[in-house]
Amino acid sequence: MTIVYLSLGTNMGDRAAYLQKALEALADLPQTRLLAQSSIYETTAWGKTGQADFLNMACQLDTQLTAADFLKETQAIEQSLGRVRHEKWGSRTIDIDILLFGEEVYDTKELKVPHPYMTERAFVLIPLLELQPDLKLPPNHKFLRDYLAALDQSDITLFSAQQTEF
């Protein structure tokens, strides 16, 4: 089994409902268990301004799927929830990013793990570190909290600390 950390984000429609539906779909993946989910945070758009605010969260899973198969499954969930990939950093019903896939490192056209922008995004690190405060970034094993300490966190607010049982 491999421990996987994901970041989920949405800024269209009923944002909280999209997060919930994505979590339910992730919990139903074959050979996969949803172990934990973070609180939900509201943040301004990153990368492309002038959009609606995002809701962001993280979750931890345990899977027997390969990273490539896991990516296909998350992309299928995005598509089933109406995700249309027409603009980089544009609005989306749901975005599911693989942040960490065990200690594995991937650098292919389809998959880059650890996620290449995670250390630059407080809206990713805050919920991720809520799940695992001592998490380290492979392969250098630097604490992720050290990256977070260097980032502006002023535009991130707690939206919901509510936890759902699976």
Curated annotation (Swiss-Prot):
Q: Please state the Enzyme Commission number of this protein.
A: 2.7.6.3
- Output the Gene Ontology terms for molecular function: 2-amino-4-hydroxy-6-hydroxymethyldihydropteridine diphosphokinase activity; ATP binding; kinase activity
Reaction catalysed by this enzyme: 6-hydroxymethyl-7,8-dihydropterin + ATP = (7,8-dihydropterin-6-yl)methyl diphosphate + AMP + H(+)
* Domain of life from the UniProt record: Bacteria
Q: Which cysteines are joined by disulfide bonds?
A: none
SUPFAM superfamilies linked: 6-hydroxymethyl-7,8-dihydropterin pyrophosphokinase, HPPK
- Give a GO biological-process term: folic acid biosynthetic process
InterPro entries on file:
Hppk (IPR000550), Hppk_sf (IPR035907)
Q: Which Gene3D superfamilies match?
A: 7,8-Dihydro-6-hydroxymethylpterin-pyrophosphokinase HPPK
Q: What does this protein do?
A: Catalyzes the transfer of pyrophosphate from adenosine triphosphate (ATP) to 6-hydroxymethyl-7,8-dihydropterin, an enzymatic step in folate biosynthesis pathway.
Q: Which NCBIfam families match?
A: folK
What protein am I looking at?
A: 2-amino-4-hydroxy-6-hydroxymethyldihydropteridine pyrophosphokinase
Q: Which organism is it from?
A: Streptococcus pyogenes serotype M1
